[in-house]
């Protein structure tokens, strides 16, 4: 799993320059391994998510990282990523799915697609 994490952190960093310190990001993510699930989609894309109980006693699936290589970015690959998370959530009796990483979500097309799939796209966050 560690080699998969490192591979995709490096690919995303090369494309998007999205991590202040990729090695530090890798070390943080390694600490999440007991809860982390990673699914690669034919070396085109990846999604990483954690499954854990929330404070209300319900299981939640929270997306930690998703990335698609530029040549494969489309609504179809994104829909596949989301469906994979939904399938995992159902198999693990999760009651909620949170999609919260901020790479690419400023794209209105992605937000519209999420909305069509039943997701709320209005979140409250503050970057510090």
Where are these regions (language model features)?
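Conserved acyl-CoA
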Residues: 77-96
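A short, internal acetyl-CoA/4′-phosphopantetheine-binding micro-motif in the GNAT/acyltransferase core
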Residues: 64-75
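Short amphipathic alpha-helix that is part of the acyltransferase structural core
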Residues: 1-23
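Conserved catalytic-core motifs of GNAT/GCN5-like acyltransferases
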Residues: 100, 120-128
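Conserved beta-strand-loop-alpha-helix junction that forms the acyl-donor binding cleft
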Residues: 97-109
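A conserved beta-strand-loop-helix scaffold within acyl/acetyltransferase catalytic domains
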Residues: 15-37, 46-57
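A conserved beta-turn-beta hairpin within the catalytic core of GNAT-like acetyltransferases
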Residues: 53-63, 120-121
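Glycine-rich phosphate/pyrophosphate-binding loop shared by adenosine-nucleotide-utilizing enzymes
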Residues: 42-47, 61
């Amino acid at each position: 799993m560690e080699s998969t994490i490192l591979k995709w952190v490096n690919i995303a960093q090369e494309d998007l320059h999205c991590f202040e310190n990729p090695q530090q990001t890798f070390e943080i993510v390694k600490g999440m391994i007991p809860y982390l699930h990673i699914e690669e989609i034919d070396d085109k894309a990846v999604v990483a998510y954690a499954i854990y109980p929330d404070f209300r006693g319900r299981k939640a699936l929270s997306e930690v990282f998703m990335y698609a290589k530029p040549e494969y970015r489309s609504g179809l690959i994104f829909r596949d990523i989301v469906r994979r998370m939904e399938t995992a959530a159902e198999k693990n009796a999760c009651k909620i799915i949170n999609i919260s990483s901020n790479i690419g979500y400023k794209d209105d097309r992605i937000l519209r697609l999420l909305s069509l799939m039943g997701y709320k796209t209005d979140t409250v966050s503050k970057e510090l």
